Every structure is written in C-alpha cells, then in structure tokens.
C-alpha cells in the first residue's frame, strides 16, 4: 500500500460538517477522516446528526469511525474550538445543551461572527414539518434509508466483480423525484432565509436535508446567503470559511492525505460487548 506524502494543513477560520451518521454503515468514515486530517480550522462546527443515536448499535462501531472521533479530540487539543450542534438523529444530547468542557461545547445553534459577518448555524430539523408532527414517520424513513444503503453496498460488490461502475441507489431515487424534492427543499430554504433576513444575518447555514447548497435567497426585506453543509453519506461535503466567505467543498482524495495506519478496511469493525465495556470501566476506576 502506497502512503501519500503529507501535505500542509489547510488553515481556515471555520469548518462546518453535518450528517456524518457515525454508528451506522452509511457513514463514509475513511473519507471523513481524510478530510479532517487535511484541515486546521479555528472553529469546527459539527452541525447535527453526527452520531446517529436513532440507529446506533453498540455492536457496530468500525475503527475508521472511532478514528474520526479521535481526530476531532486531537483537533480540540491543538486549539480548535469544537461546537456540537444537536440534530434530530442525536436529539438525546439535547439534555446536555449548555455543557462546555475545554474547547468542546454542546449547543442548539451557533452564531459565528468573523470580521463582522454573522453566520447563523443550526441543524434545520426545527423547520421540518415531518419532525414536528410525525417523528415516527421520520424514524421509519431513516430505517428505510439505512436498509437501502446496505443493499447498495451489496449491489456495488457484485458490480465491482464484473468490472462495472458503482452506483448510488438513493441518489438515483432522489433524481427520480427531483421535482418534488426541489419543492420541499425550496420551502425549507425559504423559511430559513426569511428568518435569517429578519434577524439580519449575512449567512444562514443548515444541514439535515442532505442537500448541499450555496445560493442567495431574496425577499422584499433583503437577501441572505443560504448554505447547506450536505452530508458524509453520499455527497461528502463541508463548508469552509476562508477569505471572508463560505465555500462549499466536495471531498477530493487528492487534496487530503492518509497514512497506512489510518487506512482501515470497511469490514474491519470493532465489536464492543457489555463485558468489554465493563472491563474498561473497571480498569479506569482503578487506574491512578
């Protein structure tokens, strides 16, 4: 295995990522790890659905996903301020909103003021009608989406064996219903934009809908730059604040780097049993 030569870290004012869905088979942890190891932001905003508590299984947490967590901790130790914005898939963390430990805090939103430009950052589920009135339907949809990604992986294995290109079933389905999805997204965007304009923010940043975007939205009272950080399930996108503006970036392996130690096979997973967890806790209690 060839090891890529390390490149200089990209120094940024801020980075926003969302919808990583750690703890599920949908998460593209290796790519996310590579991206995080390529940047050095002053602020890292984890904009919701970072850990997928809805679908989390204690028997499944791949090493690659564990390394993502370790990398975020390492970034905090090196001075990056990390703010965890709670989403719907990790809503159990809402009871801890307001908690701050060192460079880490759990919040419902972030208002980031860089050089006088205010960014209003929140997950976006607050403006999701399904989440407000039919949470069971949202959870059912999440389960179906997870099942689809598993089927997708199996299909891609067979396609690879026959030398065919990989496909994304969920992306194809989105294209089939593009007009309907565009209507839903537009309503979501307009709601966010109207409030942002009213509050006089320059930028409004969400996640939640797995639909990366950067666009101006106007109404009779003004305009705002609407951004969506996308996800790390299909789109592999992030938002970077540099040179007094936000950029929507797509993961490119050539712009990142991994060492041999970081490269982890998707099938290489860490099975965490209750017994192992108890033993670890017991050792921690007894250690100096």
Regions found by a protein language model. Give the residues of each.
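Core catalytic region of metal-dependent phosphoesterases/phosphodiesterases
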Residues: 5-13, 22-114
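Active-site glycine-centered loops adjacent to acidic/histidine catalytic or metal-binding residues
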Residues: 19, 48-49, 87, 123, ...
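Non-catalytic terminal accessory segments
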Residues: 106, 115, 169-202, 211-212, ...
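Hydrophobic/aromatic beta-strand patches that form the interior of the parallel beta-sheet core
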Residues: 15, 45, 83-85, 120, ...
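Active-site-proximal beta-strand elements of phosphoester/diester hydrolases
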Residues: 13-21, 118-125, 225-230
